[in-house]
Amino acid sequence: MTTEKTVVFVSGATGFIALHVVDDLLKTGYKVIGSGRSQEKNDGLLKKFKSNPNLSMEIVEDIAAPNAFDKVFQKHGKEIKVVLHIASPVHFNTTDFEKDLLIPAVNGTKSILEAIKNYAADTVEKVVITSSVAALASPGDMKDTSFVVNEESWNKDTWESCQANAVSAYCGSKKFAEKTAWDFLEENQSSIKFTLSTINPGFVFGPQLFADSLRNGINSSSAIIANLVSYKLGDNFYNYSGPFIDVRDVSKAHLLAFEKPECAGQRLFLCEDMFCSQEALDILNEEFPQLKGKIATGEPGSGSTFLTKNCCKCDNRKTKNLLGFQFNKFRDCIVDTASQLLEVQSKS
C-alpha cells in the first residue's frame, strides 16, 4: 500500500489515542478523514492541526445510532482505503450497563462495518479496530496469578455475568464489540475485501498530543497518574495494576497494523510490562524534586511484590515480533506524562 495520499478514515478522531494516530498518519503522508461528535469538536481539532489540507472532519453524533456511519461512507466511500475504528463508549457513571456500555459498543462496531459493506466494499482494503486487553481477559482473570494473557485469550465473562458492575460491563463491551467484528468478517467474506486487525492495549499512559487537552478532562488511564500527583503526603490511594503501554506506541501500532501484511487477521496485544500505582508513585517521588515530601509515598519499593501476589502474567511475544519495535519503558512514560501535567498546572 503506497503512503502517498492513501485516504484513512479515523473514527473518534478527537480522543486521546486517536489524536496521536491522526498526527502520525499526517506526518507519514496519509490523507485523513476523521469523525467527531460535534461541529465544535471537529473545528477544534482542525484548528489544532493548523487546518492541514490533508485532514478533514465529519460529524458522527452517536456511534451507536442505527446507520451512524452511513453518511460518511456515502460521501467518501469511494476514496477511503483504510478504516481505523477507534471510537468507543468509555464511561462508568451508569447503572444500565447493557443500554449505556454493551449495546453502544457492539452497535458502533456493527454500524461502521455495515457502512463499509454497503458503500465501500470495493474500496476499503484494511480495517483496524481499537479493542482492549479487556477483550482478552476478565477483571477476575487479571487478578489471577496463574493466568497468562496472550493474543489467543478471551475474556470469559458472558453478556449477563459482565453486568455485575461498571468495570466488568466495560470490559465485556470490549469483548463483545471485538467478537462482533470477527463474526462480521466471517459472515460477509463474499461481499467485502478488507482484512481485519485489532489493537488490544492495556492501560494507556503517556502525554496528550496537545497539552491543553488536559484542561478538558483526560482519559481514565491518564487520570490514574493525575490523581497520584494530587494525593497529599500520607493519603491512602488505590493500587491500580495491570498491563501498561505508552500511547505513542499504541499510535505507532495502529499504522503498522495496516501497513504490514503480516498483521492482517491478527490481534495485537500491546503491553510493555505490568505496572501498579505504587511503582508510579516511586517514580514520581524519585524524578520530581518538587513533589517529594508533598505527595503520597505508599510503601516504596513494594510494587514488584504486589504484582507477583495480585496480577496475572502477560505473554505478547507474538505481537512484539509482528510489530518489530521496542515499546517505551514505564519510567519514561510516567515521567513524560507527569511532566506535561505539572507544566499545565503551573500555568493555570
Curated annotation (Swiss-Prot):
Binding residues for NADP(+): 41, 170
Residues found modified as Phosphoserine: 339
Entry keyword annotation includes Cytoplasm: no
GO cellular component, one term: cytoplasm
Pfam name, any one: Epimerase
Example GO BP: ketone metabolic process
EC annotation from Swiss-Prot or TrEMBL: 1.1.1.-
GO MF assignments: aldehyde dehydrogenase (NAD+) activity; carbonyl reductase (NADPH) activity; oxidoreductase activity, acting on CH-OH group of donors; oxidoreductase activity, acting on the CH-OH group of donors, NAD or NADP as acceptor
Keywords of this entry: Oxidoreductase, Phosphoprotein
Other remarks in the entry: Present with 2340 molecules/cell in log phase SD medium.
Family, per entry: Belongs to the NAD(P)-dependent epimerase/dehydratase family. Dihydroflavonol-4-reductase subfamily.
Protein name in the entry: Putative uncharacterized oxidoreductase YGL039W
